[in-house]
Amino acid sequence: MGREVSAGTQQEAKEGRCLLLALPCPALLGESRGPAPPRREYPTSEKFPGIPPPPSEYVLSVLQFTYPTLFQGWQTLVGGLLLHLSWKLGWVEINLCSRSEILSWLPASVLFVGIIYAGSRSLSRLPIPVFLTVHNAAEVITCGFQKFVQKEQTSHLKVCSVLFLLAAAVCLPLCDTQFDPSGYLWALIHLVCVGVYKVFHKLWKPGSLSDLDQQYINYVFSVVLLASASHPAGDLFSALDFPFLYFYRFHSSCCASGLLGFFLMLHTAKLKSSTTSGQYAAWSFLAKVITASLSPFFFAMTANVLTISCLVISGVGEALLVYTERTGT
């Protein structure tokens, strides 16, 4: 019986016949629940033996656990609990003495929720390289704010790199043979939230809050907000009908996703604090290149020459941006 259910799961994932809907959020956009498009397929274990899909993507796109308030709430809950435990054990240092500074950071926490929510909805419909191309265009908001609002001097090379990122993100939907309006809409919302988050972080003058302090506040706020939104969004009771609710693969993937997300956050925070901004930008760029390069081994992606050209242009634009950050030009 277990083998028949497992085989059925793989067949549905391969053929794109989703059992549930792709990350619904009627509370945010008034979007009706409908079947997710057969955007992506996961390779079978026979083709890539021993290489499982990333845990979060497996939960969202294969098992089709399409309840983002619950899934993102779970991830932030795990991250918050592990960060709190690390703090109490003395492994990390967190200082939350000033209530005024905590309150002043809450707008960024709202944007953080928007980033993870919109990002998860977009990633359930768009291939990872496409999503990263749109994500990179958030730098346009940051650079535009510096140049036109703060009147900072911006080098021609940096302007050129930002224009590359913008051109790639704008042209990509026009070249995409599997254009998904909902996926790109959520990617756009994610882009705006990331850009505004960076601008807020640049304007905000912290007195004592470190990156880990800020992340701790983000975790706590996200858990409270997402838990409160789970009932109005309809996710709380709808998840009870999830067909794989009691499957060990679902439980283990959720646990692995929460753990990996926390350790990635912790490593990123330590890397950011121990390197220069240019070095951190270079490592971040390398991580994106590796992620985009490995994603075809997990997800089938239909791309033509124009689509690949947009991805390359975005990569060139970010490489130039890293160069300007390292050289200070």
Task: Specify the residue positions occupied by each region the protein language model found.
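Polytopic endomembrane small-metabolite transporters, centered on the Drug/Metabolite Transporter
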Residues: 1-329
